[in-house]
C-alpha cells in the first residue's frame, strides 16, 4: 500500500528531499538538495509512535556493529555536495553517510541502529563541517567560547595572552611558551594548533620551536619579514613538513612584493592578509594570488565591503599594531594599509575563487565569532551585485555555496596539514559537526558536536520541566567536562615533536595529531578556490585589474545575517 505525500508534507515530516530548495538565513542564497540517500517509505525518525523502536527501525545488533550516534535525515552542505542523508558517528569519527535503520527488516540500510545508538534529529536541519580559523591571535582564552558557539571547532595561530607581541602577531615564541600553551590547550573543548615565531635568519631558533610542538611558523612584518628570514623559515619548514604563514612587509622596507615572491623560491606558503586593508605589501599584496605556490587567505574585518568598512579600520589598526596617532609616521603607516579600491576587489576575488580561505584575525582587527557570518554575507553581496556564478543556474546557488563553505573548512585543513582529520564531512574524519536551522544558518548554530559528542547547544532554563523554556542561550554540554574534554578534541603538533615524546614530557591529556603534507599542497589543491589570475594594482589609483578585467564593486549599505539576529 502506497501513501503519497505532498512535497510540503514530506519536508515537514522528514526534511527536504531531492529537488527541494533551502534559503540560507535571510540571504538571497538558495541551495538545492542534489541527492537523497533514503528510500522513500523506509525513512527512520525517533519519537513516540515513530520508526526507531525495538524490532522496527532499531535492530538487535550489538554495540560493535551499530553506530554510537546517528543524525537522521539531515541536509549536508560540504565542498563535495549538498545531499540529504543519515550520518553515523562511531568512536568519535564519522563512520558513514547513508541510510540508517534496521538491516534485518529494511532494504538499503548502510548504517545499523541498535540499543547502543543515540539519535540526534536532523530533520529540517543543515549540517556542515566544523569551521577552521587559521588566523588566531591567542590574546584571551575566552575567544574559544565565542568561536565554538559560532561553529568554529579548530583554531590555528599563535600567542601567549595579552602580551604586546601577541596583540599584533600570531606567534607563540620559543619552546617555553610553546609548552605552556600546549598545556593550556588541554583545558579547552576545541582543536588547537600553534605557530612559532618564524622571524630568524638562522635555522636553530626555528627548529627548536618545531621540536617543541609548533605545527608551523609565522613570519610577521612587526618582527621583520626580510627576504633572509623568509628564505630561512621556508627552508626549515621544508625540512620538517610544517607550514609557514606570512604577514608581509607593508612599508616595503626590505623589498617590494616581487622581492618577497622571489624569496619564496616557489615553495608553498600561506599568505595571511592577501587583502585590501589588513597589511602586507602596500598597495599590491593581492598580486600573490596568481602564484602557484601561494595559498592566500584574507580576514573578516573587511568582509564584505560596506559603507562602514573604511571608517572603523583606522582606529583598529592604531591599537593592534601599537601605533601612536600623534606621530605622523605612524599615521601614514596606518593610512597606507586602508584602500577602498583593494577592499572592493577583495570581495570579487573571493567570489571568483582567487582567495582560497577566510579567517578572523581575532582581537587583532578581526572578530573571532564572525568568520562564518561574514563568509556568507560576502557570498550574498556578490550574488546580489554580480549574479549567478558559472555552474549555477536560476534555481540554486549550489556551486557558490560549495566555494564559500570550502573557504573555512577544507581549504584551511589542506593548507595546514590537518585534512586527514578535519575539514569536511567524510567517513573516517573526526566528527566535528555543526547543526543549523536554515533560518539561522551561518549565524546561530543549533548544536555543535565535537569528536562525536555534543559540546555546545542552545539550551533553555536548566530548572524547567522541558529543555526549551527561556532563557535559551548557548550552554556547554558534557563533551566539555571532565575526562570527556580530552577525548573529544585534538591538539595538532609537528611530527618532529610527536616523535620527541612531548605528550608525556609536558603531561598532556589530549590526543596529539601530527600535521602532514604541508609542503606539497599548492594553489591547485584549493578546492573551488584555485584561480590564479595575473593581478596588477595601480600604484596611484589602487585600481585592481585581474586577467585584464577591472575589479570593482559598490559598498553594501544593508547586509543580511546582521541586526535582525542580534536584538539582545
UniProtKB/Swiss-Prot annotation:
Binding positions (substrate): 220
Annotated binding of Ni(2+) 1, by residue: 135, 137, 218, 361
CDD domains with a match to the protein in the record: Urease_alpha
Residues forming the catalytic site: 321
GO CC terms in record: cytoplasm
Intracellular or extracellular location(s): Cytoplasm
Reaction equations catalysed: urea + 2 H2O + H(+) = hydrogencarbonate + 2 NH4(+)
InterPro entries the record matches: Amidohydro-rel, Metal-dep_hydrolase_composite, Metal_Hydrolase, Urease_alpha_N_dom, Urease_alpha_subunit, Urease_AS, Urease_asu, Urease_asu_c
Biological process terms in GO annotation: urea catabolic process
Keyword annotations: Cytoplasm, Hydrolase, Metal-binding, Nickel
Cofactor(s) required, per the database record: Ni cation
Pathway of action: Nitrogen metabolism; urea degradation; CO(2) and NH(3) from urea (urease route): step 1/1
EC number: 3.5.1.5
Posttranslational mods: Carboxylation allows a single lysine to coordinate two nickel ions.
Highest taxon listed in the record's lineage: Bacteria
Cofactor binding note from Swiss-Prot or TrEMBL: Binds 2 nickel ions per subunit.
One GO molecular-function entry: nickel cation binding
Matching PROSITE patterns: UREASE_1, UREASE_2, UREASE_3
Domain Urease: 130-568
Pfam family, one: Urease_alpha
Gene3D superfamilies per the UniProt record, alphabetical: Metal-dependent hydrolases, Urease, subunit C, domain 1
Family: Belongs to the metallo-dependent hydrolases superfamily. Urease alpha subunit family.
Assembly notes: Heterotrimer of UreA (gamma), UreB (beta) and UreC (alpha) subunits. Three heterotrimers associate to form the active enzyme.
Stated name of the protein: Urease subunit alpha
Organism: Burkholderia pseudomallei (strain 668)
Lineage of the species this protein comes from: Bacteria, Pseudomonadati, Pseudomonadota, Betaproteobacteria, Burkholderiales
Amino acid at each position: 500500500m502506497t501513501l503519497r505525500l505532498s512535497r510540503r508534507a514530506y519536508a515537514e515530516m522528514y526534511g527536504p528531499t531531492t529537488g527541494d530548495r533551502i534559503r540560507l538565513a535571510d540571504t538571497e542564497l538558495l541551495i538545492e538538495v542534489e541527492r537523497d540517500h533514503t528510500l522513500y517509505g523506509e525513512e527512520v525518525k525517533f519519537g513516540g509512535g515513530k520508526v526507531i523502536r525495538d524490532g522496527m527501525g532499531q535492530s538487535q545488533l550489538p554495540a560493535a556493529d551499530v553506530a554510537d550516534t546517528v543524525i537522521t535525515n539531515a541536509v549536508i552542505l560540504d565542498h563535495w555536495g549538498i545531499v540529504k542523508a543519515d550520518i553515523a558517528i562511531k568512536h568519535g569519527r564519522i563512520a558513514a553517510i547513508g541510510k540508517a535503520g534496521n538491516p534485518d527488516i529494511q532494504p538499503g540500510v548502510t548504517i545499523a541502529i541498535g540499543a547502543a545508538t543515540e539519535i540526534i534529529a536532523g530533520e529540517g536541519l543543515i549540517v556542515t563541517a566544523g569551521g577552521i580559523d587559521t588566523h588566531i591571535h591567542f590574546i584571551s582564552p575566552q575567544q574559544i567560547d565565542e568561536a565554538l558557539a559560532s561553529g568554529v571547532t579548530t583554531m590555528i595561530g599563535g600567542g601567549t595572552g595579552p602580551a604586546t607581541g601577541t596583540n599584533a602577531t600570531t606567534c607563540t615564541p620559543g619552546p617555553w611558551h610553546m609548552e605552556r600553551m600546549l598545556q593550556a590547550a588541554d583545558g579547552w573543548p576545541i582543536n588547537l594548533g600553534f605557530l612559532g615565531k618564524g622571524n630568524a635568519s638562522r635555522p636553530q631558533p626555528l627548529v627548536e620551536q618545531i621540536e617543541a610542538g609548533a605545527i608551523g611558523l609565522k613570519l610577521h612584518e612587526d618582527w621583520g619579514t626580510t627576504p633572509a628570514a623568509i628564505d630561512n623559515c621556508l627552508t626549515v619548514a621544508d625540512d620538517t613538513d610544517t607550514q609557514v604563514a606570512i604577514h608581509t612587509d607593508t612599508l616595503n622596507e626590505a623589498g617590494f612584493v616581487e622581492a618577497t615572491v622571489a624569496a619564496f623560491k616557489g615553495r608553498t606558503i600561506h599568505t595571511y592578509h592577501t587583502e585590501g586593508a589588513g597589511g602586507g605589501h602596500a598597495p599590491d599584496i593581492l598580486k600573490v594570488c596568481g602564484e602557484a605556490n601561494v595559498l592566500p587567505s584574507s580576514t573578516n574585518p573587511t568582509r564584505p565591503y560596506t559603507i562602514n568598512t573604511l571608517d572603523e579600520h583606522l582606529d583598529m589598526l592604531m591599537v593592534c599594531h601599537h601605533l601612536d596617532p600623534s606621530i605622523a609616521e605612524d599615521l601614514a603607516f596606518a593610512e597606507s594599509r586602508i584602500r577602498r579600491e583593494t577592499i572592493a576587489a577583495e570581495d570579487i576575488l573571493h567570489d571568483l575563487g582567487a582567495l582560497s580561505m577566510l579567517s578572523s584575525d581575532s582581537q587583532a582587527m578581526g572578530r573571532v565569532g564572525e568568520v562564518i557570518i561574514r563568509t556568507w554575507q560576502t557570498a550574498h553581496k556578490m550574488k546580489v551585485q554580480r549574479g549567478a556564478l558559472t555552474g549555477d543556474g536560476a534555481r540554486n546557488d549550489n556551486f557558490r555555496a560549495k566555494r564559500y563553505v570550502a573557504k573555512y573548512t577544507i581549504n584551511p585543513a589542506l593548507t595546514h596539514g590537518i585534512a586527514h582529520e578535519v575539514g569536511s564531512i567524510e567517513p573516517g574524519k573526526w566528527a566535528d559537526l555543526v547543526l543549523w536551522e536554515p533560518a539561522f544558518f551561518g549565524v546561530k548554530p543549533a548544536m555543535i558536536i565535537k569528536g562525536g559528542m555534543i559540546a555546545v547547544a542552545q539550551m533553555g532554563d536548566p530548572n524547567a520541566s522541558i529543555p526549551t523554556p527561556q532563557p535559551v542561550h548557548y550552554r556547554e554540554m558534557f563533551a566539555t567536562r571532565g575526562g570527556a574534554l580530552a577525548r573529544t578534541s585534538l591538539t595538532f603538533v609537528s611530527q618532529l615533536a610527536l616523535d620527541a615524546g612531548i605528550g608525556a614530557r609536558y603531561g598532556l591529556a589530549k590526543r596529539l595529531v601530527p600535521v602532514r603534507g604541508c609542503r606539497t599542497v599548492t594553489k591547485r589543491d584549493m578546492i573551488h578556490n584555485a584561480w590564479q589570475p595575473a593581478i596588477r594594482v595601480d600604484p596611484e589609483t589602487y585600481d585592481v585589474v585581474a586577467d585584464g578585467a577591472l575589479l570593482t564593486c559598490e559598498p553594501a549599505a544593508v547586509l543580511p545575517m546582521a541586526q535582525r539576529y542580534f536584538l539582545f
